[in-house]
Regions:
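Transmembrane beta-strands of outer-membrane beta-barrel pores
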Residues: 35-41, 79-85, 118, 132-138, ...
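Outer-membrane pore/translocation modules
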Residues: 86-180, 228-229
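Outer membrane beta-barrel transmembrane domains
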Residues: 195-278
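Residues on the lipid-exposed face of transmembrane beta-strands in outer-membrane beta-barrel proteins
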Residues: 33, 63-67, 77, 112-116, ...
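Hydrophobic, lipid-facing positions within transmembrane beta-strands of outer-membrane proteins
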Residues: 29, 59-63, 108-112, 154-160, ...
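Detector for outer-membrane/organellar transmembrane beta-barrel domains
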Residues: 28-29, 147-224
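Repeated loop/turn-to-beta-strand initiation elements of outer-membrane beta-barrel proteins
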Residues: 72-77, 122-126, 169-173, 202-207, ...
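Outer-membrane beta-barrel biogenesis signature
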Residues: 15-45, 52, 202
Length: 278
């Protein structure tokens, strides 16, 4: 009985941070306002090498929310309501000529998901998630028509998560695997990853690893200056630090980078945020 109670308590604690095999409890929720930034003058080319590009920056302000409709069924929304993509001015030393910079701002591609708990209230919990990616962003914008706040394709992803708590230690691990069906001649993707987290009362550090592998079965053009491209691949570890201010409110920060990739910026991705638990 004590073990079951501990498992329930640690699962409720982990649920509030989203992701993993735990659905939200009925009428429970997790809502987060985040600011994300990535800027780079380096790019992972299609062959995996790192090449120089004109400096590009992407700023994303977003809302992420999870709400438990039942003890097994959770609704999830990711809405980047303000995305700004910029391209630096280029100045040629020999001629003195310049190419002006460029900027684009709009909303971004939005994800709507349903998660269902297949196995709950056990040391190992398993859930399945169906995600719909709505192409609300701009795939070709700015005066240069090369800036983006989205990829312009409607995707559907099916993902399975499994999580395990190491009773009596406040440690958990999670792993997932998913298939992402992309439209508009974009290649489909296989995605998988893992994370390990500690629930140290108010301080919750989480280490994540995400991997995206293209199936190379689409012929859409590959972007050469951002993250919204066909045949994007990467292996990316991320460290996330969460701090509980009280029972409901908390703050978080994270930093991640791709140590291998294709068709994606070759620089760290930074994020800060504040969250509310119901």
């Amino acid at each position: 009985m004590k073990k079951l109670i501990f498992i329930l308590l640690i699962s409720v604690s982990i649920q509030t941070f989203g992701g993993g095999g735990w659905p939200q409890p009925k009428r429970g929720g997790y809502f987060k306002l985040s600011q994300n930034f990535i800027g780079s003058s380096n790019f992972f080319a299609p062959d995996g090498s790192i090449v120089d590009i004109t400096t590009v920056r992407l700023y994303t302000t977003s809302i992420y929310g999870e709400y438990g409709f039942t003890s097994r069924l959770t609704g999830i929304v990711y809405f980047p309501f303000f995305v700004r993509n910029t391209l630096n001015e280029i100045q040629y030393n020999q001629s003195g000529n310049t190419e002006p910079g460029d900027a684009l701002q709009s909303i971004g591609d939005t994800d709507i998901s349903i998660k269902y708990g297949l196995i709950v209230n056990k040391p190992v919990v398993v859930s399945a998630t169906l995600l719909f990616g709505l192409p609300l962003g701009v795939a070709a914008g700015g005066s240069s028509q090369i800036l983006q706040t989205g990829d312009g394709e409607f995707n559907q992803m099916l993902k399975v998560d499994a999580s395990y708590s190491f009773y009596p230690k406040p440690v958990y691990v999670s792993a997932y695997a998913g298939f992402n069906n992309r439209t508009n001649s974009f290649s489909d993707e296989v995605r998988f990853g893992a994370e390990v987290g500690l629930t140290l009362k108010k301080f919750i550090p989480i280490l994540k690893l995400n991997v995206v592998q293209s199936l190379y079965n689409g012929n859409a053009e590959e972007a050469q200056n951002g993250i919204f491209s066909n045949n994007t691949e990467y292996v990316s570890p991320t460290l996330e630090l969460n701090y509980q201010l009280n029972d409901k409110w908390g703050v978080s920060g994270s930093g991640g980078f791709a140590f291998a990739g294709r068709n994606i910026l070759a620089s760290p991705n930074w994020s800060i945020g504040a969250y509310l638990k119901l």
